Amino acid sequence: SFSADKLFGSVQAGVILGRKDLIARLKSNQLLRMLRVDKITLTLLNSTLRAYLQKDFAKNPTLALFNESAQSVKEKALRAQKDIKLKCELKESKSLVGGGSMPDKTLPSFVLAFVGDAFALQERFRKLGIVGRIENECFVLDFRSVLQGEIQRLVELINGEFKGKA
């Protein structure tokens, strides 16, 4: 058994695989009626699995971000950096995939490291709904976790919060 959300980046559902005779025994359990998934969950899980099989990463943001090249991540970070008024530096980094299926897996990434008190910056960014991390005593935003369509809004939020603080 495994979790569809953790393994596939899909809907929250438990999946049981195994021998036909063992699955048949599970089906006869009265708890099955209470624990079975609905049609919407099955439809969404089916869509995720089809995207995997067809390598259609655009349909699943998690897959898109995992499969993005380091160069593409760097370009997103540079695009944001040129418009952000707050002083920041582009740095090479590693993104931790995490989750139950790949807790220690890392992917090459690029971050913008912001100059200043890392903990104070982290708190101000979180109030804006922007989640980063502290790495080597700097507050950083990891651009492997930023979608292309989010960059402009991210820049607007940062510039709005830190007016005149370049």
Regions found by a protein language model. Name each.
Residues 1-81:
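Active-site C-terminal subdomain of aminotransferase-like
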Residues 33, 52-56, 87, 128-132, ...:
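Short secondary-structure junctions and interdomain/linker hinges
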Residues 160-166:
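Generic C-terminal helix-cap and adjacent flexible tail
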Residues 150-157:
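Charge-rich, low-aromatic oligomerization/scaffolding segments with amphipathic character
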Residues 74-149:
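Conserved C-terminal alpha-helix-loop-beta "cap" of PLP-dependent enzymes
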